[in-house]
């Protein structure tokens, strides 16, 4: 028989759909449809970026359940009307502190510095992480990985990018002014 080994995972954004994606990934892994040790690349954006980082870190499912299901997300993501009105002015839905707070337990649980670069993250996980961000000035998608932006921090990094005549800071996987 021909064995098909899954080596690549793609996770889209979609806010609360993160929970559905997580459930599908967990059940399919438990049924041995895929194995994290065979994964070479993971692609994610927005909420899918958070799940992508979780998978790269190879936590066991019980620990992952505790992070995804039992975490008081409402204390991390304070969504209100003003947040939605200011999305374009801020060039992002949440500021950097929210993203750091979201990923902090995952990094600290594996004794990984919150300032880790994409290059170092690859060497720690041995999985090629691709996170997609949008240049809101040019409306272009940017693929961020250790191959394209090795010195960028996975969360909270510089550098300052110039897009046309406007400036936008890229902070890890999200854009912030």
Report residues per predicted region.
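Patatin-like phospholipase
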Residues: 3-10, 15-107, 141-164
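Short, flexible turn/loop "capping" segments at secondary-structure junctions
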Residues: 2-3, 135
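Short, structural beta-strand-to-alpha-helix junction motif
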Residues: 108-125, 159
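Active-site gating loop/helix substructures
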Residues: 124-177
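Short linear sequence motifs
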Residues: 14, 114, 168-169
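Short coil/turn segments at secondary-structure boundaries
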Residues: 80-82, 116-121, 175-177
């Amino acid at each position: 028989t021909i064995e098909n080994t899954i080596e690549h995972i793609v996770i889209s954004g979609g806010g609360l759909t993160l929970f559905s994606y997580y459930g599908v990934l967990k059940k399919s892994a438990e049924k041995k449809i895929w194995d994290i040790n065979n994964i070479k690349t993971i692609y994610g954006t927005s909420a899918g970026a958070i799940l992508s980082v979780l998978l790269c870190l190879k936590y066991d499912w019980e620990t992952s359940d505790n992070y995804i299901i039992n975490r008081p997300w409402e204390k991390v993501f304070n969504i209100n009307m003003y947040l939605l009105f200011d999305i374009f002015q801020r060039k992002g839905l949440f500021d950097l502190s929210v993203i750091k707070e979201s990923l902090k337990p995952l990094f600290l649980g594996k004794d990984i510095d919150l300032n880790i670069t994409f290059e170092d993250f690859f060497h720690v996980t041995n999985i090629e992480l691709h996170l997609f961000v949008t240049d809101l000035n040019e409306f272009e998608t940017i693929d961020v990985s250790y191959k394209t932006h090795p010195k960028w921090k996975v969360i909270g990094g510089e550098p300052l990018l110039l897009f046309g005549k406007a400036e936008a800071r890229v902070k890890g996987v999200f854009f912030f002014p």
